[in-house]
């Protein structure tokens, strides 16, 4: 993959001073532009993720029509001299190759690498994080930059000195305390002084900003979207069938209801556009409303092939932005009106959830319970402000005071309501902050109020025992993914495809998406991917194989079956582009869940920085708690481990099962400097 030092051409032939070896600013190592980046990989890499030209993990992988995968640069360089596939020697043209799926890119991005400045920095991170590490966090790269700047300044002053006869002494404080007198880090003390930039732009050396794919792939500063407002953007793609490069969570079978972006993948269409971020909510696709539809329906709509994609999205407000959003006085005046509700008896509930906000005083309607008195009346909306109840002023009141007034009001409840003159978005989430259980931005007013299906009825699991007879050396004929500690997360082993003409394809009972629990009496549920693959291959040598698997079925309502699949996924069990649905993971039994602890810390009494939905009071069912948004500039955001769609199953060791929403939010707020969240993280659906 790389070249040896004797193949390197000196960059500065006439330089009076030797230079530090120029390094690539993406991988931190020395290589030519026509070659791949170099990484110090940690741990074993699955053979399926290795390029069989350079024998290194894939970079910018390309799939050939004959079913093989190689690095973009390796294959391009090979086909400049040859016209056949390196493996099966079938005729091949570079233009017929296409980018591998986002799932493959995601697995490769999560490979662990060691920092190239290992003498002073022993950090191990995911491959996709190395560039940011070198730029922002690595002490070795930082020292190198400081040394370069010092030497460049010294060289400039030497030139000035030769012209003017003056002498300039380096100002104090040029070097950081950790830098020794030579200006180099310990690992570089044997190197000569530098006169080149750390990340050189000299011809012949790697500078990703000027690679042939740079115009499409480089994302410098994301274009900002207005916060707390519904915005419509257009996404353009030259190939209408290429994936968007995002993963999504949510859907009306979960408390999230809306579709939320969990991750934006590098090199994807959305990443190149640069405007959408993780946590943004997608409300419409090409004017089709997906704000209250099932997860797989929304996924199918987003997967429709088109060159121009029109997305209506909502980004949550950060702290304090609402109060100042109309400081110029241009905000429309609130509409104030009366709503009189008649209860059948004094004990009947109105079906209204009331909350306070962090950035405005008073009491606000968070949600209307489906089938409740207020929802049947139809005049109240989420985000309405309650100014008074039966004449009691609540402009600076609390939800608790409002609830007491309603309970004591008898059969007539007269509400004085203020509603923004221009419809504002509203949301069913609560901020796990330091002040109140409020939302910073809300779902659109055209959303059906907070109704979602029971998840247990949407996803079903059926265990099956299968005995397959085969020739002793015949392959089982399936590909699998997952495994404990896998790059996609703590997933069980699951079937990704069943190639035709194989043993299992003839049998017909193992399907794509099945979770493998056991083979020939050997448990697979706690094995890593490589361990499980080795076990499957060893068991395949037997003339008969006994498989125990779990078939996960996502049940769509019969009336919506046709409507909710405008672009049905291929039923071919050998579809290389298939990836599992996020909802599929939610339906797995608890024995297959893998929990991990995330400790958040803060030095001030601000917000933890995430909003939650779910809990016992959602539709009077026991729904899990989901993270809906993560707010920029907060402990959760800077920690980086929490994702939208994560399930919170315990707080400081206390289980959240059966806990109400109104009980969990204050518990989170009461934690002062540290909180331990036990979460289950499932990867979102790729689109």
UniProtKB/Swiss-Prot annotation:
What residue intervals hold the motif NPXY motif?
A: 207-210
Cited PROSITE patterns: PDZ, ZF_RING_1, ZF_RING_2
Q: Does the keyword Nucleotide-binding apply?
A: no
Gene Ontology molecular function: any one: identical protein binding
- UniProt-listed CDD domains: mRING-HC-C3HC3D_LNX2, PDZ1_LNX1_2-like, PDZ2_LNX1_2-like, PDZ3_LNX1_2-like, PDZ4_LNX1_2-like
Q: Name one Pfam family in it.
A: zf-C3HC4_2
Region entry Disordered, spans: 145-175, 417-454
Zinc finger (RING-type) boundaries:
51-89
Q: In which tissues is it expressed?
A: Widely expressed.
Where do the TM regions start and end? none
Give the GO biological process terms. neural precursor cell proliferation; neuron differentiation
Its Gene Ontology cellular component terms are: plasma membrane
* Biased composition annotated in UniProt, kind: Polar residues: 154-167, 424-445
Segments forming domain PDZ: 232-317, 338-421, 465-551, 597-685
Keywords (alphabetical) are:
Metal-binding, Repeat, Zinc, Zinc-finger
State the domain notes.
The NPXY motif is required for the interaction with the PID domain of NUMB. It is however not sufficient.
Q: Which PANTHER family match?
A: LIGAND OF NUMB PROTEIN X 2 (PTHR19964:SF33), MULTIPLE PDZ DOMAIN PROTEIN (PTHR19964)
| Subunit structure of this chain's protein | Interacts with the phosphotyrosine interaction domain of NUMB.
Q: What is this protein called?
A: Ligand of Numb protein X 2
> What is the native source organism of this protein?
Mus musculus (Mouse)
């Amino acid at each position: 993959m790389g070249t040896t030092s004797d193949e390197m051409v000196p960059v500065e032939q006439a330089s009076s001073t030797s230079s530090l070896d120029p390094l690539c600013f993406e991988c931190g190592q020395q290589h030519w532009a026509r070659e791949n980046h170099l990484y110090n990989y940690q741990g074993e890499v699955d053979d399926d993720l290795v390029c069989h030209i350079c024998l290194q993990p894939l970079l910018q992988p390309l799939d050939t029509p004959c079913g093989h995968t190689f690095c973009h640069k390796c294959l391009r360089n090979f086909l400049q001299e040859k016209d056949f596939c390196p493996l099966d020697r079938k005729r091949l043209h570079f233009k017929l190759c296409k980018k591998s799926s986002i799932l493959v890119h995601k697995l490769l991005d999560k490979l662990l690498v060691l920092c190239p400045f290992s003498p002073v920095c022993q950090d191990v991170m995911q491959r996709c994080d190395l560039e940011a590490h070198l730029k922002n966090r690595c002490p070795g790269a930082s020292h190198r930059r400081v040394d370069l700047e010092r030497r460049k300044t010294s060289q400039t002053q030497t030139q000035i000195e030769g012209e003017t006869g003056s002498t300039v002494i380096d100002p104090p404080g040029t070097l950081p305390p950790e830098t020794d007198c030579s200006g180099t880090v310990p690992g570089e003390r044997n190197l000569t002084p530098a006169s080149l930039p750390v990340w050189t732009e000299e011809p012949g050396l790697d500078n990703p900003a000027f690679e042939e794919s740079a115009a499409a792939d480089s994302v410098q500063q994301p274009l900002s979207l207005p916060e707390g407002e519904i915005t419509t953007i257009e996404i353009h793609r030259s190939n209408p069938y290429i994936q968007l490069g995002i993963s999504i969570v949510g859907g009306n079978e979960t408390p999230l209801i809306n579709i939320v972006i969990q991750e934006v993948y590098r090199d994807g269409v959305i990443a190149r556009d640069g405007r959408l971020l993780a946590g943004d909510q997608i409300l419409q696709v090409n004017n089709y409303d997906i704000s209250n539809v099932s997860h797989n329906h929304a996924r199918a709509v987003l997967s429709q092939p088109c060159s121009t994609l029109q997305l209506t999205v909502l980004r949550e407000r950060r702290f304090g932005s609402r109060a100042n959003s109309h400081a110029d006085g241009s905000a429309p005046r609130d509409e104030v009106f009366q709503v009189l509700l008649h209860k059948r008896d004094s004990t009947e509930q109105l079906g209204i959830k009331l909350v306070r906000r962090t950035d405005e005083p008073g009491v606000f309607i968070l949600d209307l319970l489906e089938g409740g008195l207020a929802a049947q009346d139809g005049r109240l909306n989420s985000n309405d402000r309650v100014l008074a109840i039966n004449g009691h002023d609540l402009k600076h009141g609390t939800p608790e005071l409002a609830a007491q007034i309603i309970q004591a009001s008898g059969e007539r409840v007269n509400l004085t309501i203020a509603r923004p003159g221009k419809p504002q978005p509203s949301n069913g989430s609560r901020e796990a902050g330091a002040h109140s259980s409020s939302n910073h931005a809300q779902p659109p007013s055209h959303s059906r109020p907070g109704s979602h299906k029971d998840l247990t009825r949407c996803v079903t699991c059926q265990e099956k025992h299968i005995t397959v007879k085969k020739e002793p050396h015949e392959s089982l004929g399936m590909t699998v993914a997952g495994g404990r500690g896998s790059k996609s997360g703590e997933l069980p082993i699951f079937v990704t495809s069943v190639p035709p003409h194989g043993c299992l394809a003839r049998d017909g009972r193992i399907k794509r998406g099945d979770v493998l629990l056991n083979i020939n009496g050997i448990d697979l549920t706690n094995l890593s991917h490589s361990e499980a693959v080795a076990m499957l291959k060893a068991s395949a040598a037997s003339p008969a194989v006994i498989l125990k698997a779990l078939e996960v079925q996502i049940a769509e309502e019969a009336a919506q079956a046709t409507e909710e699949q405008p672009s049905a996924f291929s039923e071919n069990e050998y579809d290389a582009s298939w990836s599992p649905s996020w909802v599929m993971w939610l339906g797995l039994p608890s024995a297959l869940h893998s929990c991990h602890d995330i400790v958040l810390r803060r030095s001030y009494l601000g917000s933890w920085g995430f909003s939650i939905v779910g809990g016992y009071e959602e539709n009077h069912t026991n729904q899990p708690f989901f993270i809906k948004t993560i707010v920029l500039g907060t402990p959760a955001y800077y920690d980086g481990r929490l994702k939208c769609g994560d399930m919170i199953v315990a707080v400081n060791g206390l289980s959240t099962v059966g806990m109400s929403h109104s009980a969990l939010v204050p518990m989170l707020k009461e934690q002062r400097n540290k909180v331990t969240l036990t979460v289950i993280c499932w990867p979102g659906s790729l689109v």
